[in-house]
UniProtKB/Swiss-Prot annotation:
InterPro entries: High_potential_FeS_prot (IPR000170), HIPIP_sf (IPR036369), TAT_signal (IPR006311). Belongs to the high-potential iron-sulfur protein (HiPIP) family. It comes from the Bacteria. Its main location: periplasm. Residues 1-37 form the signal peptide. Keywords: 4Fe-4S, Electron transport, Iron, Iron-sulfur, Metal-binding, Periplasm, Signal, Transport. It is found in: Periplasm. One of its GO terms (cellular component) is periplasmic space. This is High-potential iron-sulfur protein.
Length: 122
């Protein structure tokens, strides 16, 4: 134990407050170890008219693939990454987000699905 008496001075209180305030941004940067995938600004939104018409979902496992399956692959294997309409060289494309001929100027998730899915040739 310390022989130093507990000091409740204003200076000590300010030090504690500043230390706490400095730690908050660091906690947000660390994110408590959780991965957060964020969609790019030009990603197809869920309320996009074309997305609604084509039943597009960024997560193919949550889409209506079984009911609206297209020929070429079993429904559980159909996703944007193996679709003919996906454009890997679109502006702003990443490993997870690519362009699509059906959504000009916007990006789709490679793990997504829509009712126009068509097996990529070759």
């Amino acid at each position: 134990m310390s022989d130093k008496p507990i000091s409740k001075s204003r200076r000590d209180a300010v030090k504690v407050m500043l230390g706490t305030a400095a730690a908050i941004p660091m906690i947000n940067l660390v994110g408590f170890g959780t991965a957060r995938a964020s969609a790019p600004a030009n990603a197809v939104a869920a309320d996009d008219a074309t997305a609604i018409a084509l039943k597009y979902n960024q997560d193919a496992t949550k889409s209506e693939r079984v009911a609206a399956a297209r020929p070429g692959l079993p429904p559980e294997e159909q996703h944007c990454a193996n679709c003919q309409f996906m454009q890997a060289d679109a502006a702003g494309a990443t490993d997870e987000w690519k362009g699509c001929q059906l959504f000009p100027g916007k990006l789709i998730n490679v793990n997504g699905w829509c009712a126009s899915w068509t097996l990529k040739a070759g």
